């Protein structure tokens, strides 16, 4: 178990403390020491490690204890620096064991969501025709999505692939959530500054139930000024919560087939209320 924990943490970029040479159970053995000193138990651990199969490309099998350690470490780092997208991604995967199956079930019971699960579309530069989207009319989803990317200097290729979700279908669900995150900014009319990110996290927390979104919504405001906190509390959070409750599941929209649809029309279809007239 210790060997498995060290390997998963190392691959995830999370450092672990190593016990000293005088610790019980030979816990201080380094990876460079002869394997013979590990005895029969070490061979069994190695066999156990080899028995953890990858469920999809990039998958890192982890135990519940490893997930707990990764969740704790990534939560601390994500709260310290909310723009550490790698830590936010690890936190989402290691704490979404209840929310992700619920989201998958919603997709399976919706015609458009079910088709998305079957076809597995991806939103990245290799699948997007950016030139065509730029030529769409102002106000259309495709044109406003590209405008959001360019105005905020972000790329759809920055979304990290899933690693720690121990189910291939659920791994796609969280990948899809990540790739439509910028679509949520577009539909909600929110920029990528801290205030805009907090508002989107409130909406997503209500929509998805992902603990990572809840933590971002709850602790993100600590970095805001008093004026922005007032706007957030009186205008933006109530609107985000009402919209999140009223809206249908955001993962049940095949956005790639809605590029020509006006943003206002799609908001109305999903159930998102018009954004408040405040400066974000």
Outline where the language-model segments fall.
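Short hydrophobic helices that act as membrane-entry/anchoring signals
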Residues: 66-70, 74-77
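Core of folded catalytic or high-affinity ligand/protein-binding domains
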Residues: 57, 61, 76-268
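N-terminal mitochondrial targeting presequence
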Residues: 1-62
